[in-house]
Amino acid sequence: MPHHAALSYPWTARYAKFLALVLLYGATVHIGNMAGLTGTPWLSTPLLWRGMDVALLSFEMVAAIALWRGLGWSVWLVFCGIIGLQFLPYTMWRSQFILQPEDAQTLNGLLGTEAFLLGMFALLLLIKK
């Protein structure tokens, strides 16, 4: 079954809209980072962090709009984007994102939350409800 059809099921469509809101929240966090509202001036953060802020802001805005509109390709975008832009960098280059001891716990929480959100979405897509 095409993914756009799966997004037409009531619970899957509702969850897609919920994920869109979660992604918009993430986008506002990246805007806050860039504006220096989250504690550290953006230009004093590592270049990798700044690049990730830009990449994730772009991804989260496009994915949120596409999910909200129920576009079939948004399913692939969300899974590939979260895996490629969060799981891989935050595990492969983990030390680059941990400047203070509490950063490790924050990363673990973020990855756990993302895994849960993707797992629920996958479950809804598979059971097609």
What spans do the regions from the language model cover?
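Topology signature of small-to-medium multi-pass alpha-helical membrane proteins
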Residues: M1-K129
